[in-house]
Amino acid sequence: MEVSTDQPRWVSHHHPAVLNGQHPDSHHPTLGHTYMDPTQYPLAEEVDVLFNIDGQGNPVPPYYGNSVRATVQRYPTAHHGSQVCRPPLLHGSLPWLDGSKALSSHHSASPWNLSPFSKTSIHHSSPGPLSVYPPASSSTLSAGHSSPHLFTFPPTPPKDVSPDPSISTPGSTGSTRQDEKECIKYQVSLADTMKLESSHSRSSMASLGGATSSAHHPITTYPPYVPEYSSGLFPPSSLLGGSPTGFGCKSRPKARSSTEGRECVNCGATSTPLWRRDGTGHYLCNACGLYHKMNGQNRPLIKPKRRLSAARRAGTSCANCQTTTTTLWRRNANGDPVCNACGLYYKLHNINRPLTMKKEGIQTRNRKMSSKSKKCKKVHDNLEDFPKSSSFNPAALSRHMSSISHISPFSHSSHMLTTPTPMHPPSSLSFGPHHPSSMVTAMG
């Protein structure tokens, strides 16, 4: 290897720890290597602090923490400020890399071949343009990453970085400052991009709560109105004294349809659940229409006498009162048939029922009301006794919202709440026995 006269003498020296056979890219025919003079190497203490290796290139355990290493790396030393050896570009086949853009190398066997502190460059015979300044992500990688691959390619092509000053004017101070400004500008634009991405993610989460956000104001604001509560928070129309439809039963019958001028031609009814017509087209109520459809004749207006099941037996009479009609035939202790009234009386009092208590008619009960109807009636009566005035007044509403605010999945973040809760509730309000963390979250 011949060294030209205009090149510095340290280019011809080879460091023992960085050999051509040990370099990961030594198999590439187009890549050349230039090395630093041993007198320009960093001190052993600085190498230990910065890169976790000793002066011979062997890895050692870190002596200082990452914070100390980041502090030391922020300020360059005066020993190796201008001498830097940069390997050439790996491949030129990347689609967004051209000759006018600057880029730092991705692979480096020795960590001090790429230094983020050098401000001047050395012109040497390299097949491609190089950059003194690493990408914006190198400042974070060099502080906490001890791998030899200190810098990586940026995710997008750097559009604002100026060409390498080593190609145009190697010793110009003005171009160096211009590159420094451009590098800072690129880093600021990258930081703005990261802020925009984070603000987009926040705005997508905030849209679930009905609020919008922008890149400059990531904290959501309260909407100008209180959104309508869903059916999961309040029972539907039960607090307002309406029909308790949420309990799964009907407390009142179906609404009867009544049209002006309509009247059943059979019974004269003016309201019915469903109006029907007979064969001639006249209106019939639902009952008369069904009766006519099933029996083929008009529904009788007088109710027929109720037939008593097992009321009449041929030749059967009560052994006590001699009646022949009853709802249920029983037997006394002797085995004789008795009517239902005499049998129950004897069962309760152990004496025969007196004849003075005999009645001509049979008193029956209305057993049509089922147990479900009774339950629905009780629930409806309890809801009517609920005070309507305290349903949606501000005190009751704020108390209800503070007690159920821990149900919301976004209640852990104060700016994600869709409705504002009072910061200091009135002293007359009393909170239920909730968990302390949920109360703190509700108070916001």
Curated annotation (Swiss-Prot):
One of its GO terms (molecular function) is RNA polymerase II-specific DNA-binding transcription factor binding. A zinc finger (GATA-type) spans 264-288, 318-342. GO terms for biological process: anatomical structure formation involved in morphogenesis; aortic valve morphogenesis; axon guidance; canonical Wnt signaling pathway; cardiac right ventricle morphogenesis; cartilage development; cell fate commitment; cell fate determination. The keyword Transcription applies. GO terms for cellular component: chromatin; nucleoplasm; nucleus. It holds the Pfam family GATA. Expressed only in definitive (adult) erythrocytes within the red cell lineage, and is also abundantly expressed in T-lymphocytes and brain. SMART domains: ZnF_GATA (SM00401). It is found in: Nucleus. Its main location: nucleus. Residues 1-29, 123-181, 195-215, 362-390, 413-444 are annotated as: Disordered. The keyword Repeat applies. Keywords: Activator, DNA-binding, Metal-binding, Nucleus, Repeat, Transcription, Transcription regulation, Zinc, Zinc-finger. InterPro entries: TF_GATA-2/3, Transcription_factor_GATA, Znf_GATA, Znf_NHR/GATA. Residues 365-378 have a biased composition (Basic residues). Residues 137-147, 163-176, 413-430 have a biased composition (Low complexity). Residues 201-215 have a biased composition (Polar residues). Binds DNA via the 2 GATA-type zinc fingers. Transcriptional activator which probably serves as a general switch factor for cell-specific development. It binds to DNA sites with the consensus sequence 5'-[AT]GATA[AG]-3' within regulatory regions of genes. PANTHER family: TRANS-ACTING T-CELL-SPECIFIC TRANSCRIPTION FACTOR GATA-3, TRANSCRIPTION FACTOR GATA FAMILY MEMBER. This is GATA-binding factor 3. It comes from Gallus gallus.
